[in-house]
Amino acid sequence: AQESRGLGDVYKRQIILPRNVHKSALNALVLCGAVPVYVNPEMNAKLGISLGMEIDQVARAIEDNPDAKAVLVNNPTYYGICSDLRAIVKLAHSRGIKVLTDEAHGTHLYFGENLPVCGMAAGADMSAISMHKSGGSLTQSSILLTGKAVKADHVRQIINLTQTTSASYLLLSSLDISRRNLALRGRESFARVAKMAEYARNEINSIGGYYAYGRDLVNGTSIYDYDVTKLSVYTLDIGLAGIEVYDLLRDEYDIQIEFGDICNILAYISIGDRIQDIERLVGALQDIKRLYSRDRTGLLSGEYINPEVAVSPQKAFYAEKKSLSIKDSVGCISGEFVMCYPPGIPILAPGERITKEIAEYILYAKEKGCSMQGTEDPAVEYLQVLA
């Protein structure tokens, strides 16, 4: 009886979520035993990025899994894509299902004007906010917001199961200082960030060969809205993968951006950046095109590969395993994560069947220099699969 109360009722229960979630969400499934019901997002074939969850997709997932306990929504995704959060909340609540929002990259949504709706304003039940990303606090400091339908004291009990008993007052102080700063100057700060991002998009697009995308992607469904503070740039048309441009910016121009993937780079513009920093980035990208551009033959686009979930993440993670080379693992069930970090979205998760396409994608990402994580083998030459 006790197990069936509140948010604790997750063991062997289902949670509806997009596959392009951060590894921390899937780590939670390993710990609690919940079973994922993936809403496989659309893919922008050119940009190689996963889009948002369409309301019809969520409705079908709820219809097929009426006992699901929660829906998890990225708001926004790493690339700035937003789903129709208000509609998802309304639909889920009508079926007695909680809505959780991953707002790791959405602190500013609570303070900006003309930005996508934030989780709490949309009626979400809980929202995880990484203040250290766009809010200005120290790395590792975050905030968990709860709605009226969630008992904060119960949430505190759950958090205490895994949280350190030796809290860092340095981190707590930085959270409070950042909270105060945003309460007093958040709107003007993020208005300036959005203005710099728009300026950067226009300047980068004028170079040619790059595509810095923004609200022009919005289609009202899989891209319901776009976070204009994000500066995501498609690079394949100059013949370089995003990770290659990322490396050049760091090694040749002393510019450290957020990350590069197979097709794109992401520059995270913060409240501490200045227009001079934007000018340096634009100038470096112009230089890279002039000095390093080449024919794009042989470059792969990023792609979304629908996962086949064979067993639950928890069962796979704790199962007996054996080690196989990536090529020899095709057809087996993965017992571990494989991901490029950042962004930390698993290419492969425990319990998913390894296909030829997944194996080839892992090998290509390694070849291009992506930082690979999640595997027991630090060189990512072998994968742990179910024995």
Where do the protein language model's features map onto the residues?
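Loop/helix-junction capping segments adjacent to catalytic residues or to phosphate/diphosphate-binding pockets
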Residues: 1, 23, 79-82, 136, ...
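Single conserved hydrophobic/aromatic residue that forms the stacking wall/gate
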Residues: 1-11
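Acidic-residue sensor for enzyme active/binding pockets
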Residues: 3, 103, 258
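Conserved PLP-enzyme active-site core in the AAT-like
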Residues: 9-217
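Surface-exposed interaction regions enriched in Ser/Thr/Asp/Glu
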Residues: 15, 285, 369-387
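Hydrophobic side chains in beta-strands
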Residues: 73, 144-146, 233-235, 269, ...
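Conserved C-terminal alpha-helix-loop-beta "cap" of PLP-dependent enzymes
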Residues: 205-374
